Amino acid sequence: MLPVVPVFNAVNALKEKTYLYLSSQLVLDGKDMTKDDILEFVQNSHGQNISVLLKDAKFEDDDLIVLLNNGVVTLFIDSDDYAAHLVEIGVPSIRLTLLKDGAYQFSFGQIQEIQQSQLVKASEISLETFTNSVLSGMKTDRPDGLYTTLVVDENERSLGLVYSNKESVSLAIETQTGIYFSRSRNEIWRKGATSGNVQKLLSIELDCDGDALKFVVRQGGSGSFCHLETESCFGNFRHGLYGLQKLLQERLLNAPEGSYTKRLFNDSDLLTAKIKEEAEELTEAVDKKDIAWECADLFYFAMARLVANGVSLEDVERNLNTKHLKITRRKGDAKPKFLKKEPVAVHEEDGKIVLNVVSASDKAAVEKAVTRPIQKTAEIMNLVNPIIENVIKNGDKALVELTAKFDGVQLETPVLEAPYPEEYLDGLTDELRDALDLSIENVKKFHAAQMQSETLDVETQPGVVCSRFPRPIEKVGLYIPGGTAILPSTALMLGVPAQVAGCKEIVFASPPRKSDGRVSPEVVYVASKVGASKIVLAGGAQAIAAMAYGTESVPKVDKILGPGNQFVTAAKMYVQNDTQALCSIDMPAGPSEVLVICDEEADVDFVASDLLSQAEHGIDSQVILVGVSLSDSKIEALQNAVHEQAMQLPRVDIVRKCIAHSSIILCDSYEEAFKMSNQYAPEHLILQISNAEDYVKDVDHAGSIFVGAYTPESCGDYSSGTNHTLPTYGYARQYSGVNTATFQKFITSQVVTPVGLEHIGHAVMSVAKVEGLDAHRNAVKIRMSKLGLLPSGFE
């Protein structure tokens, strides 16, 4: 522990003084920070021991338990009575740092007395005072005045024994890199200055006597610490888990085609199956040798899954450390499916996936069936606002940091510029390329037909001609959700109409994949086809903020379009109301939804497939079937079809949860069915009824209609030509789906001749006079007077 212990009173204080990251012990002032502030600080820390000072703080007992269960190491308290109370409610005494005789007795992990004078507000600790504090705690009895320094990596593996002097320590703190003193050259040794193996300094610690330093570093370059090009001065590390991680990380980037490891990374289903297989074999192994062998196999495949998803052993250990700190734990029972049970008779209906059935006459039941999930806007905005402010303030730097935090990808630049490198199209098959080309062609054809390019001219009075003409929105930002999903359809549904409308700059934004830091080749292909100038490699609220306000490499756009999760939606709503952004959006958004109207003649397999194609989107999707005069046998057949098809789907667990809160609403007439549909205003409306086309005229509110038995929603989602970016959550009552006009604005103009002024001038002056706007009135009066159109003495 260092001689000075920084005390923080704000979430972002550590970012302002990054050299304080070098302290392994941090204290948060509980009187100035809320529980949520502390949890956020812990979440953003870099592995330091974090304690909370409770002097003058007011926390409920439950709040303190939450803090101790989520990364807070100890509580600094002044009262023996309060300490006794905390022990009584279950806090281990080792987690309490109690004030005795003017010093806090710290005993978690190491025994240490912390004098009250050592607790210094972070705001008062400059780089100079922090450095001087470290130097003041160092001791040496060596004749050359050097300090023995043990260098370890972030996994506490010893890299080597070196020496430091006060100058090298000062430089190391200032630059936050590994800098030592070379005895052989008698000079400052900047590690990696010639070899490129630069070290990032993570923390500095003094041993219990203050006569030895420990530098915790992240080794860069080739990973070699020793001049003999080995990982440490004691040779290379044993392979172990960290060696396996390093090997798999290299294989992820360079594994030859056809290799088993390459196959594992490219086939997530195979990797999942192997993990389950090896876990089962481990449970069946009996002797020590077999158990060790099977466990090693399981570790290999588990590590492959970690690497494939950008998760490190450091991430796993961080979770283990947090679990170790928990003082209240789960019961620990296994999930029921993993417990041995006596066989029980399984009834045919057990676990069946069925929709609720309600009558349209039961108003309370109908209201419950059509109620959409509540969106907690205020709570989401509290999380989104700091992200937006960070991007506004720090630009590209914030984008890179937030992408690393939320997407697990460390980028060098947050933007991919056109023309896009050919390697970004690797993996795009000819079959999919043809499918995308067909979809783009159809969407372009339909949206080009919508294009309003001619000027509308109307002579409202003799000599008064009013005109209206379109102009493309100059710069548009198109958000394409990504990460584990591949959504080229969204890219083309937004990009094609923007291209048709003639937008001068089209910017895509999509989060990069954890596996390689790229967006999918399908999205890159669409971006090149529609002329997108760049792809912002970011997702969530940070991507929306970057496009709305602009950064060093992301141009500010005039309108943002595209679907996303609740954070994306909240960010879009924020920027459209911020005059600093001057940015509009396409529409508000909620979970995806479908309403199907069917009758006795409908094919139950078709109806079931339409319901399930929506249910697989997510557990909060809305699936409603409105049945017109359905028989009991028809309802049963529908339920059976839903269950049978659902059980064949890979996302059956999601479907099951969605269908559990989905309903069949029984109506007695088509009129009643369409009245219910119009009240709900669905995103997707599917008509599986006789003479379906005759009923389109009865639809007042819907995002898009799918007419007839052979028109599944999927066609509109991908290739028919209509747009699949549609209003949800009932906004179809006020909004249209994305169309060509979405990317246009319309300007009006008027030309008034002297003849025209004679016809409308008196009306203009009369209205202006009533409104008390004399300057408005004079603008007409002066002109008419000079034209001799006013009678003598006109006032």
From Swiss-Prot:
The keyword Metal-binding applies. The keyword ATP-binding applies. Residues 1-225 are annotated as: Phosphoribosyl-AMP cyclohydrolase. Residues 226-308 are annotated as: Phosphoribosyl-ATP pyrophosphohydrolase. It catalyses: 1-(5-phospho-beta-D-ribosyl)-5'-AMP + H2O = 1-(5-phospho-beta-D-ribosyl)-5-[(5-phospho-beta-D-ribosylamino)methylideneamino]imidazole-4-carboxamide; 1-(5-phospho-beta-D-ribosyl)-ATP + H2O = 1-(5-phospho-beta-D-ribosyl)-5'-AMP + diphosphate + H(+); L-histidinol + 2 NAD(+) + H2O = L-histidine + 2 NADH + 3 H(+). This is Histidine biosynthesis trifunctional protein. Binds 1 zinc ion. GO terms for biological process: L-histidine biosynthetic process. The gene is HIS4.
